[in-house]
Structure formats: structure tokens, C-alpha cells
């Protein structure tokens, strides 16, 4: 049986190498890169075309609310994945979560649906305004 250290050590090494490599490349680019500011480099980039209007426009609050709701429900969907993987026995000795895991995740999913219904009833997802 592998110990947790033996299991997570390769992941830690890869993470450490990735962080060191990223900071090394950023540092080298900062030290060795040319610094020639120009007007073209400071203009906002819009899909390869010339900018139309100002880049400092106000957006409606609805866009931010929808973005926050997307992040919240996306993170909650990420929490569902490990539960789905661990719910049933794997045939190699792991007994699965059983009924307690099923009931607890049922409560979690019910809370998600209740939150979605609440948001829907509040009219947050209504774009008619």
C-alpha cells in the first residue's frame, strides 16, 4: 500500500517545476526584454480591428451577476464530480459512499436547485429589462 507521501510527491514535484519554470520565464522576459513603449502598444486590442469607442465603458450590473452565478454553479458542479466517482464500490475493496453519501449529496443538489429557482424567481436571468 502506498503512503500519501508516495502518492502526492510526484504531483508536488510537477507543481514545483511548473511554478519555478513560470517565474523563471517571467523574470528572464522582464530582464532581457526590450522596453520601447509606443502609442500602438498602449491602444486596446479588439479582435484585430481598430478600436471603436472607449474601452472604459460601463457595463450593466446584470453581466456581473450572471458571471458570479456562473462561477458559483460551476464550482458546485465541480463538487459533484468526486461524489459521482466515489458513490459506487470500485470492485477493488473500496465500499463506496453508500446511502449516507447519497443522502448528503441529495441535500446538496436540492440546495443547488433551490438556489437556481430563487435566482430565477428574482428575475436575475430575465434579460427583457
From Swiss-Prot:
It catalyses: a quinone + NADH + 5 H(+)(in) = a quinol + NAD(+) + 4 H(+)(out). Keywords: Cell inner membrane, Cell membrane, Membrane, NAD, Quinone, Translocase, Transmembrane, Transmembrane helix, Transport, Ubiquinone. Its EC number is 7.1.1.-. GO terms for cellular component: NADH dehydrogenase complex; plasma membrane. The chain crosses the membrane at residues 9-29, 68-88, 97-117. It is found in: Cell inner membrane. The keyword Cell membrane applies. It holds the Pfam family Oxidored_q4. It comes from the Bacteria. It is a multi-pass membrane protein. The keyword Oxidoreductase does not apply. Its main location: membrane. InterPro entries: NAD(P)H_OxRDtase_bac/plastid (IPR023043), NADH_UbQ/plastoQ_OxRdtase_su3 (IPR000440), NDAH_ubi_oxred_su3_sf (IPR038430). GO terms for molecular function: NADH dehydrogenase (ubiquinone) activity; NADH:ubiquinone reductase (non-electrogenic) activity; quinone binding. Belongs to the complex I subunit 3 family. NDH-1 is composed of 14 different subunits. Subunits NuoA, H, J, K, L, M, N constitute the membrane sector of the complex. NDH-1 shuttles electrons from NADH, via FMN and iron-sulfur (Fe-S) centers, to quinones in the respiratory chain. The immediate electron acceptor for the enzyme in this species is believed to be ubiquinone. Couples the redox reaction to proton translocation (for every two electrons transferred, four hydrogen ions are translocated across the cytoplasmic membrane), and thus conserves the redox energy in a proton gradient. This is NADH-quinone oxidoreductase subunit A. The gene is nuoA.
Amino acid at each position: 500500500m502506498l503512503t500519501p507521501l508516495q502518492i502526492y510527491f510526484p504531483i508536488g514535484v510537477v507543481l514545483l517545476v511548473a511554478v519555478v519554470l513560470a517565474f523563471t520565464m517571467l523574470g528572464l522576459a522582464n530582464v532581457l526584454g526590450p522596453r520601447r513603449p509606443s502609442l500602438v502598444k498602449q491602444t486596446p486590442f479588439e479582435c484585430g480591428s481598430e478600436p471603436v469607442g472607449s474601452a472604459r465603458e460601463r457595463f450593466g450590473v446584470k453581466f456581473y451577476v450572471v458571471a458570479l452565478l456562473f462561477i458559483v454553479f460551476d464550482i458546485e458542479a465541480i463538487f459533484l464530480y468526486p461524489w459521482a466517482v466515489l458513490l459506487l464500490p470500485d470492485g477493488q475493496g473500496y465500499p463506496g459512499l453508500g446511502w449516507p453519501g447519497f443522502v448528503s449529496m441529495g441535500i446538496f443538489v436540492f440546495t443547488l436547485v433551490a438556489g437556481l429557482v430563487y435566482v430565477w424567481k428574482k428575475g436575475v436571468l430575465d434579460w427583457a429589462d
